[in-house]
Design a protein with these regions (language model features):
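Conserved structural motif at the start of ABC-family nucleotide-binding domains
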Residues: 2, 16-19
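The feature captures the beta-strand-to-loop junction immediately N-terminal to the Walker
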Residues: 33-35
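Helix-to-loop junction immediately C-terminal to a conserved catalytic motif
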Residues: 48
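ABC ATPase NBD coupling module
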Residues: 64-79
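Q-loop/switch helix immediately C-terminal to the Walker
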Residues: 84, 90-106
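Walker B catalytic motif
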Residues: 158-159
Length: 225
């Protein structure tokens, strides 16, 4: 599915990623974790094309995408969920879901995507994307957009950021449902134990290098290191 070969990245004379070699398998829930400043979010942005590596190659389904811009990577089937979702002024929730799907969709279809993330469609479908929506609501709307897009690979950059406990519990439910019903691949950047606990594979990043690979059955050892 996704392969990174010898990826390195530096900024302001500081080495952030150093010779990263990584394979992400299809139809798996993979989590990249590690201490703050280890390069996790930078790695996610490099995969999406928001940052350009200083060296190395990125392959998606066998195709070299190292030099492809964000929009072309999105067209190939890579989706990205930000730590803080963007508020699109003047658009409704339905507008965003329709834009994400790439097609004109019926109201009941859009409502189904909202239901998938635990939102009451009648209350949200025509709402404006504005400051009245909480961080947790925006996060789930963004996930509904990604479900509508049906990305082959969806990247979540610290999905727990900026949301309350109730919203986080709902987020875990959404991830568990996506994992059990979707044939697509999920890559999450997170240090939250409950997200690590549902991962098929856990990759530990420290000081810009991969130091270990494991799974949730070895979670206690991971968290103690």
């Amino acid at each position: 599915m996704l392969e990174l070969k010898n990826i390195s990245f530096a900024r302001d004379n500081k080495q952030i990623l150093n010779n990263i070699n990584l394979k992400i398998d299809s139809n798996k829930f993979t989590v990249i974790t590690g201490p703050n400043g280890s390069g996790k979010s930078t790695l996610a942005k490099i995969i999406m094309g928001m940052e350009t590596p200083d060296s190395g190659k990125i392959f998606f389904e066998g195709k070299d995408i190292t030099k492809l811009p964000i929009n072309e990577r999105a067209n190939l089937g890579i989706g990205f969920a930000f730590q803080q979702p963007v508020r699109f002024k003047g658009l409704t929730v339905k507008d965003l879901i329709e834009i994400s799907s790439g097609n004109s969709i019926k109201m009941n279809e859009a409502c189904n995507y909202l239901a998938d993330v635990g939102l009451c469609a009648k209350e949200y479908i025509n709402r404006q994307i504005d400051s009245k929506l909480s961080g947790g609501e925006l996060k789930r709307i963004e996930i509904a957009m990604l479900i509508a897009k049906n990305s082959k690979l969806t990247i979540f950059d610290e999905p727990e950021a900026g949301i309350d406990l109730w919203s986080f519990n709902n987020l875990i439910n959404v991830f568990e449902k996506m994992k059990s019903t979707s044939e697509n691949t999920i890559l999450a950047i997170s240090h939250q134990e409950r997200i690590l606990n549902i991962a098929d594979e856990i990759i530990i990043l420290k000081d810009g290098e991969i130091v270990d690979k494991s799974n949730s059955s070895n979670l206690k050892n991971i968290l103690s290191n």
